[in-house]
Regions:
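Structured soluble/peripheral alpha/beta segments that form catalytic or ligand/cofactor-binding pockets
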Residues: 1-201
């Protein structure tokens, strides 16, 4: 991973339970290079086309948590562009982890809601979603392509994850008021539920 942008998102999130917190940095729009081998076929990753996010954190968590996260990194009209969105993990009433990244600069967003459709009283991950922000600066439709679901349940310890990949179409507004139009922008949308003893990650 190379070409770290000038700015990235860092947040210290408290929990209601005393002594519990999460300190997290997410660096979007890193240039990625390397290769992936699938079966007998090898795919080369070149930094002119491929991007990644580095998600780094340390903290002491509460036992049972469910959170929503969306991460995107890529090119928009030739410029590095992406975002980090999330909520549900800790107390984000004072500050959120929602931000756009455009040409190496961070553009902070207010609260963002992930509207996941329901079917038979359950979340329907493969139907179109809607994303809205309280400041009106992130309004998107999300069209899922793949739900990588996995559940490991040892009763006391549990990890139930939906990692949904798909494409976003809509509008994001930068700090200077510039409206950025997005069409079929590829992104990931994980929704994990975890039960674990207090730990660091």
């Amino acid at each position: 991973l190379t070409d770290e942008p000038d700015e990235s998102l860092v947040i210290a999130t408290p929990f209601e339970k005393p002594g519990h917190f999460y300190y997290n940095q997410k660096i979007n729009c890193l240039r990625a290079s390397g290769w992936v081998k699938l079966g007998g076929e090898k795919f080369e990753l070149t930094p002119d086309r491929f991007f990644a996010v580095l998600d780094w954190g340390r903290g002491v968590w509460t036992y049972h948590n469910t959170w929503y996260w969306s991460s995107a990194s890529g090119l928009l009209d030739g410029a590095p562009f992406g975002w980090n969105l999330g909520y549900g993990f800790g107390d984000t009433s004072a500050a959120t982890e929602n931000a756009l990244i455009y040409n190496g600069r961070l553009h902070k967003l207010d609260h963002v809601t992930f509207e996941i459709p329901m079917k038979d009283r359950k979340e329907d991950y493969l139907s179109p979603w809607r994303f809205t922000s309280s400041d009106g600066r992130f309004e998107m439709q999300f069209r899922p392509v793949l739900d990588r679901a996995a559940c490991t349940d040892f009763k006391l310890l549990k990890s139930d994850q939906h990692q949904v990949f798909g494409r976003f179409t809509g509008t994001a507004v930068l700090d200077d008021g510039t409206a950025v139009r997005v069409k079929d922008f590829l992104a990931a949308m994980p929704k994990p539920e975890k039960k674990s003893t207090s730990s660091t990650e």
